[in-house]
């Protein structure tokens, strides 16, 4: 029992350190654009279950439910059969703050579904970020325990999950410029 409790605390502390250092910057370079290098992983979400002929099969990666900022419920299955972008962010992340206007513009110009997945802060701070950064044009999840992040293998922000209409998922853990984001989005349609 003590060992299990110690392991949970150690893993929790390691996760906090990882997330904190992944988005931190010194004040000297906080206003400069960050590098766009990062990690990309691709997975094909294997369909499971049966559906009616007119309903798309829900890939495993889209089998999740989460609370939205504002208190509603979002079902990942609602994205089945259509291209989508999940944007993983945190309210205090300077890279997320810088890329927010580009995300909003890409979501507005695209037919692809966008969903923000906020973690590592309170719902109140998430709401403030959405309002101040102008990214309220698409749903945002209040993933306070980072469960959706873990479901997609995301450990740091900013990150993206690009989901094809066939359910293939490409996770990119890097800050993207608006042009890089639009190129990725164009590849989904």
Locate each region found by the language model.
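Short, ordered coil/turn segments that flank beta-strands lining enzyme active or ligand-binding pockets
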Residues: 69-70, 165
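N-terminal targeting signals for export/organelle localization
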Residues: 1-63, 182-189
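Thiol/disulfide oxidoreductase modules built on the thioredoxin-like
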Residues: 131-137, 143-189
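Nucleotide phosphate-binding site architecture
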Residues: 94, 104, 170
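Hydrophobic beta-strand anchors of alpha/beta hydrolase catalytic cores
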Residues: 85-86, 114, 160
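Short active-site neighborhood of thiol/selenol oxidoreductases, capturing the structured segment around
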Residues: 75-97
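Structural microenvironment flanking redox-active thiols in thiol-disulfide oxidoreductases
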Residues: 97-133, 144-146
